[in-house]
Amino acid sequence: MMILHYLKSAVRSLMKYKIQTVASMVGLALGFVCFALSAVWVRYEQTFDSFHRGADRMYLLGSSSAWENQTNLKHRFPLAEELKETFPEVEDAAAYWYWEIPVKLSEDAAEDVNLGCVRSDSLFVRMFDVRLVRGSWSFLNVPEEVALTEEGARRLFGTTDVLGRTIYYAGNTYRISAVLTGWGQHTNFPFSIMFGMDQTEKNKSSYPDYYISLRLRSEADTAALMAQMNNSSLKYKVAKMWNGKKSVLSLEPLTHCRYTVFQDRLSVSIFYIRLFSALGLLLIVLALVNFFSMLVSRMHLRRRELALRIACGSSRVGLTGVFLSELLLILSGAVLSGMIFIEIVEKPFCTLSGIEGSIRLPVAVCFLLLAAVTFLMTWGIIVFYCHRIASRQLQPAVVVRPERFSFQKICLGVQFGICALVLFALSFLLLQVRHLAHTDIGFERDGRATIFCPDSESLKEHIIHELRRQPYVQEVKQLYSLFPQGSSGGLAVSSWDGKLDNADPITLNAIPEGQEFIDFYGLRLIAGNSLKAQGDTMAAVINETAARMMNMANPIGKKVGMWTIVGVVRDFHVSAPTVPVDPVILIEFNCPVQMGRDILVHFDESDTDRLKHFVDSLVQSEEPGVFLKITTVREAYEEYLRSERTLQKLLTVVAVVCVLITLIGVFAHVSLVCEQRRKEITIRKVNGATAAGIFHSFLKEYFALLLVACVIAFPLGSVAMQNWVERYVERMAWPWWLYAAILVGLALFVVLCIGRSVWRAARENPAEVIKSE
């Protein structure tokens, strides 16, 4: 019965302060939602491939690459068995080929389905515990047979009863002889189809094309094992890279590969996902500060009621029970509201994050943990203030004296500070992304497109001929694609004019093109002359980065290997904006570096869809089923900004939630303060104060809090964003005006929050207020 009494009292109290109750519930719910979603996302990204047996002891073998900051993951097939036989620390080893391949139901099928494919042997099956659902393992030894996972069978045929059926791939028909268990998509190698390998293919050691996974014994020392591998003379290890440097083997934990060696597969950088999680935690802090502020304000507003309860015999436990009942109701409402929000955002969130299945269970667990932590923290505050009120109940003068509570002011200042910090970060991000999207990247990106198509010269000639007849096409060339790069080649250079004796060889990104290529992309010559269309094959043009790497102040006329430098072009970006510009050399056609050429189109950017539709229709009418891809320079560059665009969306959501929580909190707080200070406002009016003067006094108080909060938040935000922007090669000028803009915006926000409540309180009839008091 006592519990029922507490609940009734709690409901009456919460109904009396409706605005504050709703503000507390909504604020906590929004904070819970943002933090829970970010926590689920981080956990999902950090648990890729964790379902394998002994996943904490599994590694992916890597080796150093000729290109800086890159790791080579492909090796010769026999190296896996050699490592297992040579090093007792290796418990299991498996080599496998993995790629996504287009599969058809028959040769005449109009459409193909892209499936993750693995080619390997029984060692892969044993190491990764691949289970046979139906059929036999004969496909591992019979080249004409293949196995599908249950998920792959459903995608192709709509059923798992597929034994004996056939599929078509790469000009061959394969019979399905097995159905296997799959791994789903929560893995770095989501395969749906598996081929076996005959002994002849396994013994081929000429070209490294296979991933190698190792499972080490529990007592193995990873660092010591890597040292032994690199000091041993392994027969199937690539001893030296093509630039002459020694190849160094490394072991990357399989569960870390998602955000290390395979980070380019991420739609959002793991750094940004963790940042989103940190922002979710910041929102929880904001919501809790908002909640605690209103809780303490309500307790002080009810101090007479509480003192009367104590005078009538109520104990501290009883007072605590009243407030804990209110707390339980508010937390229950927040959790229920949060689950409703989750229902609304679950689908778009899963699409953005790539999480499979429902997230309701982990989110619900996260909600309960957050609610429990909030309950325990609030319990402490309630006990403290109940003890304080009980200790003063025999001092009426103290109880009834109006007070200005510093706790609420601190809470408001924290809310303003967090809001200013998030708004500054979002605004800075938007400006930097806009700068990256519109900055000069060293070549023309407007109206340039690349058509990647098969090596059919007749088809290419036909496409070029038809494109030149289109009114929106200015120019069509068959050249190397600069951006996006279709293929790339490295040129190891160990000698050049002015080279120091202790200087290491350098690797240049070699482009076998001349003047036609330079003109098409609008590369800017800053020194010397350009390459002639049919000039000296020993002439070369380099970029600024190559000149700096070779320490050439005036490179014109100097030798690089067998080539003579005739010109220098301005640096141009053909990689992500976080990656420094590569050293580049442009050389004539008859050179050792051989690269494929694609169809380059200069056209009106507004007709992008029209161009794509025309080329697709043309190719399908000439050679149906031929794979063709059209990409504009702008689309390819936007792909590099994909993580930043996603972070922009996440930060926008966080900023909106942050402003909303602060708006609700400030409005609710001002409503309580106006209720608490009604008599003070009335006495001021009786003594001659005007409504405008009272409103001005409130504004001064809140503007002072806002100014102090911004003075603290802006330096913190500046340091954080300075560290973030240093990741980029191209950076915008520091926006000093942004501080004033955010401060003015938040000041208007404060006026909006407090205006109605303060103005209404200031215009009340003093006689009515005195009567009610």
Predicted regions: what they are:
Residues 1-7, 12-16, 20, 52, ...:
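Membrane-helix entry/capping segments
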Residues 1-25, 262-265, 295-306, 310-328, ...:
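Alpha-helical transmembrane segments of integral membrane proteins
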Residues 13-15, 308, 319-320, 662-665, ...:
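A generic "structured core" feature
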Residues 16-43, 268-304, 332, 407-432, ...:
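Hydrophobic alpha-helical transmembrane segments of multi-pass inner-membrane transport and secretion
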Residues 38-102, 201-202, 208-215, 219, ...:
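Membrane-proximal extracellular/periplasmic loop immediately following the first transmembrane helix
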Residues 121-134, 146-268, 465, 469-639:
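Mid-to-C-terminal secondary-structure elements
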Residues 305-350, 679-726, 741, 745:
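Transmembrane alpha-helical interface segments in multi-pass membrane proteins
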Residues 363-384, 420, 663, 710-712, ...:
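Hydrophobic alpha-helical transmembrane segments of polytopic membrane proteins
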